[in-house]
């Protein structure tokens, strides 16, 4: 609610109802005031044939001249910009971590990337990138010749971090499964930020 006071907005939540129902049905709820902060929250539950036409149902609720952001908190389409709700948005937010196969989700996002697409896995490595960059200011002042990124197999943020390091250093980057850590190899020492 505090954020909504600084950035008032309208939030439209689209949730699937019974897709297999014979009759189209729209259950809607509007929240204003205390329940929504300075926001208006519209909750739409689409059932039956209507479930396949979410963008048509959402369009009348959009505010004119207001940026639209579509966020899939769970499983997102392979190409978010091609999804009917994604086509309405200037920014599309996904989270590969919640996908059935997180690494495959990241790979499919790369193939279908369109300007305006963001995956929260990239945001999760912001502090790691800052920490690793600041580690370069410490002795020994030598180039990085290798790197190791270790952690959960199912965490795509670590795969993205390994890819980011591979694009930045002149050396091999290894992705391992194990304890969470990053090692930066240099000719005379290995740096492990903590």
What residue ranges belong to the model's regions?
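Acidic, Ser/Thr-rich peripheral helices and adjacent loops at domain boundaries
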Residues: 25-34, 86-98, 183-193
């Amino acid at each position: 609610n505090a954020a909504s006071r600084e950035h008032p907005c309208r939030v439209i939540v689209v949730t699937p109802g019974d897709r297999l129902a014979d009759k189209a049905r729209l259950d809607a709820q509007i929240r204003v005031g205390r329940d929504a902060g300075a926001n208006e929250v519209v909750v739409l539950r689409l059932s039956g044939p209507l479930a396949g036409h979410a963008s048509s149902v959402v369009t009348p609720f959009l505010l004119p001249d207001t940026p639209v952001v579509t966020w899939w908190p769970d499983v997102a389409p392979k190409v978010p910009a091609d999804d009917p709700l994604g086509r309405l948005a200037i920014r599309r937010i996904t989270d590969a971590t919640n996908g059935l196969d997180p690494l495959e989700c990241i790979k499919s996002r790369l193939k279908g990337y369109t300007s305006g697409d963001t995956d929260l896995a990239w945001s999760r490595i912001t502090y790691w990138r800052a920490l690793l960059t600041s580690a370069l200011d410490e002795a020994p002042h030598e180039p990085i010749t290798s790197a190791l990124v270790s952690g959960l197999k199912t965490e795509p943020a670590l795969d993205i971090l390994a890819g980011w390091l591979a694009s930045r250093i002149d050396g091999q980057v290894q992705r391992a499964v194990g304890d969470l850590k990053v090692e930066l190899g240099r000719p005379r020492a290995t740096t492990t930020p903590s």
